[in-house]
Amino acid sequence: LQLVFDNSLIGVAIDRFGKEIPVLKESETQFRTFVEISVSKQFYGWLAGIGKGVSIVEPKEEQEKYRKYLENIWKL
């Protein structure tokens, strides 16, 4: 899974995924990382808690699943 985070969330990413995650500069304000995880509703909830500070970049299928998850919450 490829994720892009705001730079201010580096500690959050390390707390969640560990110190060994790759951290690549995406822009002046963001970094990209690659993680191997089992995606679940709990993971989506964690992402939603961070808000706009993180986004799923790849795979596109997972990005779409997360978007649908958020839409379903919005409909509640």
What are these regions (language model features)?
Residues L1-L76:
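Polybasic (Lys/Arg-rich)
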